[in-house]
């Protein structure tokens, strides 16, 4: 069973909260959910929507086609009516609204919709869009949201303005009734979201007054499987991973979609801290600093790391561009700092609230000169949690910056994660070569066989840090022999990491290893491809790359042998993964499925693309799904 549900309305009217309540309630009934929220770079007023896929087994993707659409305004109907295939819940008050009256809609999109409706013989109003949907076997459910909101206001004896947002509860209540699930799960989800009695009572009345508007359609039954599951988004997964992994300092400058991670850490600062030297535990807090800009943010994190605490920062493309100067300083001084890089659409400001995978090559080679950096890329929320910890361990073990890539899709999507996938029993801190103190002979940049020097914290020994090339003590040096040796010392750490980190842990492989088709991907498209692999008849081996530096070249090269087609699936124009594969293995990728319109890969559009590539032999397919 797989069902697609979408809720949409004006940004700032509680769409995200309503979707989370609905998702929580469905998950509580035992179902798996994958959800993604899309929103404009606008505080209030523009179109926002949340897509949820509900299934009785693990699900990792959404589709373009919608089973149930919940709309509150005219724009949501106009934006999504074409994709609805079963039920469309709409606001009765907007039926006569003309598309030209929707000022918030992109003019290009409005013209396309007007042209479509006109050619199909319908008027360019909400009514016309609804008639088209009805003619295509969609069940229409008109709702008088204002009437229910007024009824609740009268019953609660509060102004109508107070009950405005119960309209969202009406929409999700009707949806929940259509599913046929026990309404008590919905009430519990509402009460866990709202803490004030007034709002709890208001919303419970809204549930009561709207529950009988429709009859059950899907007749879902609560799952009998008793399993511990988490329902969380990518920002939260990374934040919890950092807290669990021992971060004690987090700096940031507000930027979408990275800020939510730091806000979560700030709200959960109280932790049990462990002394890195003695292992003693005591209560403490995580320091979270909102810096004046991104360069200050990374410099603060670097300074904190030098004192011995696990330190990190979080940013997105424009912010990372500003951090690069500090990144180079950290590379020169072998500072174990972690940067969580939330990828959004560029260049420049680009698409601030939309997704992309265009920043892949950039972080691997960011900075002037050459210095080692480890680059990880998470593919789902469980990986995002574990990779946040892995990044901290790698940074300290190899005394080098680590960049953790998380796309906007992963950051702002939600899923139900089985507890065991987090593998908490396998997670532990690895702090590398730490010395409690150093005498006069201590050399912070001592030459060693593996390039990794014993690390003392500030205040524990005499040491010098500078952006210039330096000798073992840290003093500035332009000596030719020292320059060669110190440069090699730094770069050798990446070679050591390449030898020590098993290539099998830097990738994940799914499907039939003997397939003639190999698909190479990374990040969020992995989940879409896994769903296709598990539920469709496509024949391919799926290779997910989880670490791009050091690149798992030997394993990737071996997996490419004997294939008819080697296909990359990624969210950028240049097929950057194929460029890296060619660079590291010397082998060519034969086909690419690409997308750069700012929206995530959707299962149905990707299935169509795979047919074009695998069966029809197209070399390059560009996708443009989403709204």
Curated annotation (Swiss-Prot):
SUPFAM superfamilies: Pyruvate-ferredoxin oxidoreductase, PFOR, domain III, Thiamin diphosphate-binding fold (THDP-binding), TK C-terminal domain-like
Cited Gene3D superfamilies: 3.40.50.920, 3.40.50.970, Pyruvate-ferredoxin oxidoreductase, PFOR, domain III
Motif mapping: YPITP motif: 253-257
Binding site for substrate: 256, 344
Protein's gene: ST2300
PANTHER family (UniProt xref): PYRUVATE FLAVODOXIN_FERREDOXIN OXIDOREDUCTASE DOMAIN PROTEIN (PTHR32154:SF16), PYRUVATE-FLAVODOXIN OXIDOREDUCTASE-RELATED (PTHR32154)
InterPro entries: 2-oxoacid/accept_OxRdtase_asu, 2-oxoacid_Fdx_oxidoreductase, Pyruvate:ferred/Flavod_OxRd, Pyrv/ketoisovalerate_OxRed_cat, Pyrv_Fd/Flavodoxin_OxRdtase_N, Pyrv_flavodox_OxRed_cen, THDP-binding, Transketo_C/PFOR_II
Protein name stated in the entry: 2-oxoacid:ferredoxin oxidoreductase 1, subunit alpha
GO biological-process terms attached to the record: response to oxidative stress
Reported regulation of activity: Inhibited by low concentration of 4-fluoro-7-nitrobenzofurazan (NBD-F).
First-level EC class: oxidoreductase
Job description of the protein: Catalyzes the coenzyme A-dependent oxidative decarboxylation of different 2-oxoacids such as 2-oxoglutarate, pyruvate and 2-oxobutyrate to form their CoA derivatives.
Keywords, ordered alphabetically: Oxidoreductase, Pyruvate
């Amino acid at each position: 069973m797989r069902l697609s549900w979408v809720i949409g309305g004006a940004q700032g009217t509680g769409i995200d909260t309503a979707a989370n309540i609905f998702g929580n309630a469905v998950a509580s009934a035992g179902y798996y959910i994958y959800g993604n929220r899309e929103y404009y770079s606008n505080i209030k007023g523009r179109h926002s929507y949340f897509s949820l896929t509900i299934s009785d087994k693990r699900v990792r993707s959404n589709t373009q086609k919608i089973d149930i659409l919940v709309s509150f305004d005219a724009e949501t109907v106009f934006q999504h009516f074409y994709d609805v295939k079963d039920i469309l819940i709409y606001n009765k008050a907007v039926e006569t609204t003309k598309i030209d009256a929707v000022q918030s809609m992109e003019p290009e999109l409005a013209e396309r919709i007007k042209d479509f409706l006109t050619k199909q013989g319908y008027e360019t109003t909400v009514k016309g869009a609804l008639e088209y949907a009805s003619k295509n076997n969609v069940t229409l459910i008109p709702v008088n949201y204002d009437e229910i909101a007024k009824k609740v206001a009268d019953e609660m004896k509060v102004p109508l303005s107070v009950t405005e947002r119960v309209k969202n509860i009406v929409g999700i209540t009707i949806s929940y009734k259509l599913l046929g699930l026990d309404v008590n799960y919905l009430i519990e989800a509402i009460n866990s979201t709202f803490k004030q009695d007034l709002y709890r009572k208001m919303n419970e009345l809204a549930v009561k007054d709207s529950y009988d508007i429709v009859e059950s359609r899907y007749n879902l039954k609560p799952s009998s499987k008793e399993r511990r599951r988490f329902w969380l988004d990518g920002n939260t997964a990374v934040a919890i991973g950092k807290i669990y992994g021992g971060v004690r300092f987090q700096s940031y400058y507000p930027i979408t979609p990275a800020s939510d991670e730091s806000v979560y850490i700030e709200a959960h600062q109280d932790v049990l801290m462990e002394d890195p030297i003695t292992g003693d535990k005591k209560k403490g807090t995580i320091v979270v600093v909102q810096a004046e800009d991104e360069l200050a943010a990374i410099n603060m994190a670097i300074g904190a790391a030098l004192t011995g605490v696990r330190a990190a920062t979080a940013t997105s493309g424009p912010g990372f561009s500003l951090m690069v100067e500090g990144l180079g300083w950290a590379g020169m001084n072998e500072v174990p700092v972690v940067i969580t890089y939330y990828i959004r659409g560029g260049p420049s400001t680009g698409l601030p609230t939309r997704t992309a995978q265009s920043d892949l090559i950039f972080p691997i080679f960011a900075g002037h000169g050459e210095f080692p950096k480890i680059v990880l890329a998470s593919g789902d929320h469980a990986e995002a949690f574990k990779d946040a910890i892995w990044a901290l361990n790698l940074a300290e073990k190899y005394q080098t910056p680590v960049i953790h890539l998380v796309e906007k899709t992963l950051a702002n999507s939600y899923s139900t994660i089985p507890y065991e996938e987090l593998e908490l029993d396998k997670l532990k801190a690895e702090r590398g070569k730490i010395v409690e103190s150093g005498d006069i002979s201590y050399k912070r940049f001592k030459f060693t066989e593996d390039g990794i020097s014993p690390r003392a914290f500030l205040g524990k020994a005499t040491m010098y840090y500078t952006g210039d090339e330096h000798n073992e003590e840290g003093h500035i040096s332009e000596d030719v022999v020292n320059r060669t040796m110190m440069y090699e010392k730094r770069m050798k750490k990446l070679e050591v990491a390449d030898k020590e980190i098993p290539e099998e842990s830097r990738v994940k492989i799914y499907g039939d290893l003997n397939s003639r088709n190999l698909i190479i991907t990374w990040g969020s498209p992995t989940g879409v491809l896994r769903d296709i692999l598990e539920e469709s008849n496509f024949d391919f081996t799926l290779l997910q790359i989880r670490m791009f530096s050091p690149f798992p070249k030997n394993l990737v090269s071996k997996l490419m042998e004997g294939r008819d087609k080697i296909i990359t699936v990624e969210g950028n124009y240049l097929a950057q993964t194929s460029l890296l594969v060619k660079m590291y293995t010397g082998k060519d990728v034969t086909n690419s499925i690409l997308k750069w319109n700012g929206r995530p890969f959707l299962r149905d559009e990707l299935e169509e693309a795979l047919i074009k590539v695998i069966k029809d032999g197209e070399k390059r397919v560009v996708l443009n799904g989403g709204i």
